[in-house]
Amino acid sequence: MVWCCRGKVVKSEQASQTQLRSAGTTNSNTAESGLVQMTTAQKQFFDKILPTVQQVSQKKGIVTSVMLAQTILESAWGTSQLATNANNIFGIKADTTWNGNSYTVSTKEVGNGKTVTVERKFRAYKTIFESITDYGNFFTSTPWRTKNYAKFLEAKDYQSAVSNLQASGYATDPIYAEKLISLIQRYRLYQYD
C-alpha cells in the first residue's frame, strides 16, 4: 500500500508502475492531482512526528514544513543509523554545549569544495520526541546561536527559512536548501505552515 501526502490512498498495483526511485515520486495517476506518494513506512513515520513537530514549530516560531523536510532528509524517514540508534532525526551534533549522551557515526561533510567522510559525535536522545523538542530549543540555546539563527527564526515562509538556514551554516552541504525545498514541494509540506 502506498499513501499520498494528503492522506489519499493509491492502490499498490498503481504504485508499482513507478516504484519510489528516491525519496518519493509521482505516477501518472497522481501527477495530475499533484499528490506525491509515501510508502506505508514513510506515512507511519510522518504521522508519528507531525503533531510534535507542529507543536514545537508553533511554540518556537519555526516554519513547520522546514522542520518536516529536515526530519525526512536528515533521518531518511526515521531509518538512518543516527535515527534508529540515537533517536536523532535532525542530525544535530554533540558539541561542547551538549551535556547529554552522544552517538558517534561516520558522516559526509563538505569543506573547501570537497566531500569527506568523518567520524562525528551527535546528540543522542531517549525518544524522537526529545529530538524534536531539542531541535526547537537549539537555535536559541546560546547567545551565539540566537544571533546566528535570528533570520532563520524570523522567516515566515519556507523559501526564506531554508535560505537563511543554509546561510547560517547549519549544514555543510552546499545544496542543503535545495534539497529541503525539493522535499517541501514534492510532499506539499507547505500545507502545514
What are the language-model segments listed below?
Residues 1-193:
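Catalytic cores of secreted/periplasmic lytic hydrolases that degrade extracellular macromolecules
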